[in-house]
């Protein structure tokens, strides 16, 4: 976790950064037949101050939105809003091809307080998507980018303005490889493996 680089410690305590947060899903059911043609999933706080980019997205691709704070009066033609769900119900409600991890007021880059936060810390949203069986899309300058590229469980982009072209150049076979890897990572997340690994190091 890159935030550790920003912290100066004056103690002798052993620290260990989680690669990604675990996310337990009761009664998980694996998805089949995912396709890269599906909409991009955005789940979480959809309010202007955290997700203002939702109101200035390009016309493609399509987006499926889940969460609170969304201003439906400003909904774009390529957005479908499904409302909010209880945490245990949300994973099974998600529909799409990729989960998007993006914050801030701009679709050009992750900006503002919430966008800058992604440089240094991991998002629980990423764990939700992966644990639910979806590959993810992350900002190229985010703390999660290296993890995603190393595990080949998603893609990174510098701007959402580039996303249509990136997806057009991604073959169905390449997408299915991302799905396979995302499901493998997701299983470890659901089992609590990343926390257990951290505890083993600390012990």
Give the positions of each predicted feature.
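Conserved catalytic-core segment of nucleotide-activated headgroup transferases in glycan assembly
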Residues: 17-95
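Nucleotide-sugar-dependent
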Residues: 91-132, 138-146
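A short acidic/histidine/glycine-rich donor-binding loop in glycosyltransferase catalytic cores
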Residues: 151-157
């Amino acid at each position: 976790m890159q935030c550790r680089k920003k912290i100066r410690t004056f103690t002798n305590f052993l620290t260990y950064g989680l690669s990604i947060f675990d996310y337990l899903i009761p009664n998980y059911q694996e998805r089949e037949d995912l396709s890269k043609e599906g909409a991009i999933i955005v789940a979480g706080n959809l309010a202007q101050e955290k997700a203002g980019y939702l109101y200035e997205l390009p016309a493609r691709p399509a987006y499926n939105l889940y969460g609170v704070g969304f201003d439906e009066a400003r909904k774009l033609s390529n957005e479908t809003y499904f409302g909010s769900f209880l945490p245990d119900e949300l994973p099974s409600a998600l529909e799409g091809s990729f989960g998007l991890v993006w914050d801030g007021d701009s679709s050009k880059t992750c900006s503002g307080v919430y966008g800058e936060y992604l440089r240094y810390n991991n998002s629980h949203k990423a764990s939700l998507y992966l644990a639910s069986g979806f590959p993810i899309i992350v900002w190229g300058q985010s703390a999660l980018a290296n993890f995603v590229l190393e595990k080949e469980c998603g893609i990174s982009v510098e701007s959402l303005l580039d996303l249509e072209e990136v997806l057009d150049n991604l073959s169905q076979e390449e997408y299915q490889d991302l799905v396979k890897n995302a499901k493998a990572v997701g299983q470890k997340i659901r089992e609590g493996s990343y926390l257990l690994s951290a505890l083993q190091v600390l012990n």
